[in-house]
Amino acid sequence: MPAYIHEAMVAAYVRDATYVPMDDETLGPYIKPWLGAEGQEAFYRQIFQNDPRYTDEVQPLYGRIERPVMIVWGEEDRWIPLEKGEQLHKAIPGSQLRTIPRCAHLAQEDAPEAVAEFLTDFLAP
């Protein structure tokens, strides 16, 4: 595939991961690893491996987790719906689920202050 078409496809894909439109400067570091011949191959390999069976097979092990877990999820995530975050929360004993309204998959871009606050609270002694 021509590099310019691949780059446009990757950019469109990554832009869909935020609720707030992402500018080109912010987008750059997200798409750079998926550009060039090796990056293009890696991108499509990752897309083809996006199969629930890979997580479904380890899901029974989640109940064994004995460490504190905080799950941060954007309520407008179009890549992995909030329902999956809720299932994960139910499967991990004692976990916390923190959701962010008007936020998609890349919560650190859509709501950096909320993510920082959640992490600060979670990691505080």
Placement of each model-derived feature along the sequence:
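Catalytic active-site module of serine/aspartate enzymes centered on a nucleophile-bearing elbow/loop
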Residues: 94-125
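Helix-rich cap/lid subdomain of alpha/beta-hydrolase
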Residues: 1-32, 41-45
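Residues at helix-coil transition
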Residues: 15-18, 35-36, 93, 124
